[in-house]
Amino acid sequence: LSYSIEWGGTYIKSGYGADTSGIQWADNATFETKINNGSLNLQVQDEYKDYYDKKVEAVKNLLAKAKTDSNKDNVYVNFLSVASGGSAFNSTYNYASNINPEIAKTIKANGKARTGWLIVDYAGYPWPGYDDIVSEIIDSNK
């Protein structure tokens, strides 16, 4: 199986791991790692143990970095998920219902700008009265 991805001017071919040990992934962090034998910089925000304010700040910080970066060798991956305790007020759904609209507003305010890859819980879910994050991501790429 062979594949390739072209996203925002960045081209990744199958078999792009850093080396035989794979992609180095930091736990609960925003970090940079190399892939494609060091030719691509993977910028990742995966602070999943944080609560709303800190998580939204981390997501917005990586969006701002992606927006101002024209280097096609930098790939941005932004996870909007938060680990939850399982209760109704501390659930994945509850976090997504607050984080997704907030980030959708930020993407809309940024206009036509590079966002990188956003990994979203409840993508496309219609939060009443709020902009849809999927539509805003697509519109930012037009």
Which functions belong to the PLM regions below?
Residues 1-142:
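Catalytic cores of phosphodiester-bond hydrolases, prominently lipid phosphodiesterases
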